[in-house]
């Protein structure tokens, strides 16, 4: 699996979790789903920031996009921390979760459809993307083993 396919799969998994969270009225269940979302996003951000973005920054025409994505990561991480610290019955929990959903979906859409991924497909060889995919998979598995 190449790097872009792996990152797309991560985006889809989180999107499914968002739908699951939005589909339940049970606040404790919603908090449980949020913790799963938090874990998925932490792993995803870590592999993007340590493996994917550094590889993409080698291409001059991608540097601004990478910087923008890193800024979005900072905002998303701050929001994750805020939500994590809220009790599930807090009146702010649902509204902050909704903002998180919107921010992450915007970030994924920007990467996949509008800007980054299409440009990467033009710039990088399939061999480079496959190699990067393997590196991302290794980093992801390492992160998940640490979390267990």
Where are these regions (language model features)?
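Small-residue-biased structural context
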Residues: 1-148
